[in-house]
Amino acid sequence: MSDPSAAGTVAPVPVQVPFEVRSLRRRQTLLWLLASALLALLALLSSGFFLYAAVVTAAVLGIGALLPGASLLGLEVRRSLEAETVEIGGTVESRIELHNLKDLPALWLFWKDEIEPGLAPKGITCGFQSLKSEETVRSSCILHGTRRGLFRVGPSMIETSDPLGLIRRFRVDPEVGFVTVLPRTVDIGPGWPLGYRPIHEVPRRRSLSEDPSRFLGVRDYRAGDSLRRIHWRATARSGRLQVKLFEPSVLEGVLLAVEMGTAAWPHAPEETGTDPAVELAVTAAASIAEFVLVNGQAVSLLSNGGDAAERYPSDWKGGSFRRLEDALHETEARRGIPAYRPLDVEPGQGRWQLDHLRTALARLTLAPGLTLPELLIAEAPRLPRSLVVLAIAPDLGGGLGEALAVLRRSGFEVGVVWIQRAGAEPAAASLPEGVPVYLVQDETDLERLGAQAL
């Protein structure tokens, strides 16, 4: 969507005739000239029946060849969606209008609205009809969100042919819409993984940042202490250099690090990435985010997955085609994402942040490239240390332990939500000592997550 133009006084612009309509008028003029020439030729050579039949046949075929292209000219498709986001199991109404702008009728039109799997349509999504000049036909259907994701509604493919069905033309309209089906959330019980208290009540055990307003006491000077921390009055009283101590900064929220690399989920379908274990990981992230935000804390998101929006080209313009295969190819989304960028949502609070996070998680797809441990190490210098780094992954190996150890040495509080596939045998863990691990095999485990403290 383009930004609204700046407000201002604009001179009235004369109405311009669309290029397609002007092209149609030129074709009409050419057709009348051709018909006149044929009639003149027929008048001069009317002595032979076979010549007459040949001229008539040629005229019929010529007109038939022009009709399919002429029918597609001057057609306008308008689309509207009742909403752009919907919960799983929710519905949204899709409306479509097909308008004939030209002076001639549009004959023998077959239109079909392309709707991606994940949105189950109920209602009219195709039709066969002819449109009079300036006539508009309207249709609507109800779309049911059946699974998490970003789904395209449209484009419409319009097919027309000559009266004999010998020549067919296809048009793919550029008008499309998108519906985001949000992930499920589960109510988490009281408590929090780092203890029986909410995050904001848990002081940090190690911290590179301290709260200077929370004076704790003094201690003897050690090599490397900053001179700005020296407590001069205590030094004068004791005769030894004394350094001020402050309480470590309290934790302000959680950073959800979600593993979405294709190598970590070998059982997930390559094209759609829909898999019960993958969906459970996304549900866990959305549920934890909601729990923390409701308690007034901040949530950030980091993932090595891809954005489903990258599957759809931004320069979509539609077009007209002679072959059905070309039209169908044009309506398909890319099977792969051309370039992957790690998903990163800045820390935030409140309802707006929850909506932002759920939308980002809805569009999250599996992607090749960096693993989650590699991403955590690469992003460690810029991650906020006031947030708990909570990794959500299906495997505790693959370098995750080393990455969490690096983060702990840098002053981060860390934890792991282990998404284990039903029936899978527990894998050997290689995590640093003291890192809390929370096993999640289904949504029931998520409901009990808040009461766990390891």
Model-derived regions: residue spans:
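Extracellular/lumenal glycan-associated context and N-glycosylation machinery
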Residues: 1-79
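Short, charge-rich amphipathic segments
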Residues: 22-35, 92, 168, 204-225, ...
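Short N-terminal helix-initiation segments at or just after the protein's N-terminus
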Residues: 20-24, 36-44, 86, 121-125, ...
